[in-house]
Amino acid sequence: SHLTKKLLYLDEEVICLDNYFTGRKSNVHSYLNNPNFELIRHDVTEPIQLEVDKIWHLACPASPIHYQFNPIKTTKTSFMGTYNMLGLAKRVGAKILLASTSEVYGNPEEHPQKETYHGSVNTIGLRSCYDEGKRLAETLCSDYQRMHDVDIRIMRIFNTYGPYMLSLIHI
């Protein structure tokens, strides 16, 4: 919802896809009457046909309590969600930004990590559904960029917490 607020402030048109697995409609309630905002209940593991010029791909449960609740869905969201968003970007010529995570480094052996550091990962641990899903999403992005010349950016987000996020008290 912070990104939506900023994009609407910049007078951008925003189409928000959400399946409400970790989000709440109330997070974007104040934008529902904005003519530049459209909310679609949709799971990105399913393809969607839209006409857009930018895609901000943020879909994936990022909290351990969420991604461990259904680890297969978490991996599927990272893989199929990214695959579907990349397919959309390719079809309409949109730029895409993938929200990845510092978790792709696994249990790093160097601090701080450089962009060239490949990490020290556990592919079968309890957190692997999230970590490896994001690594796979980054791989898909790199392959789409090389093979289809899709304009892609990847941001690796480290620890975050703030307004609109669910706390353990609410779960």
Question: Each predicted region: which residue ranges?
Answer:
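Conserved GTPase G-domain signal focused on the G5
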Residues: 164
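N-terminal Rossmann-like NAD(P)+-binding domain of SDR-like oxidoreductases, especially those catalyzing
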Residues: 1-160
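Conserved small/polar residues in nucleotide/adenosyl-binding loops
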Residues: 169-171
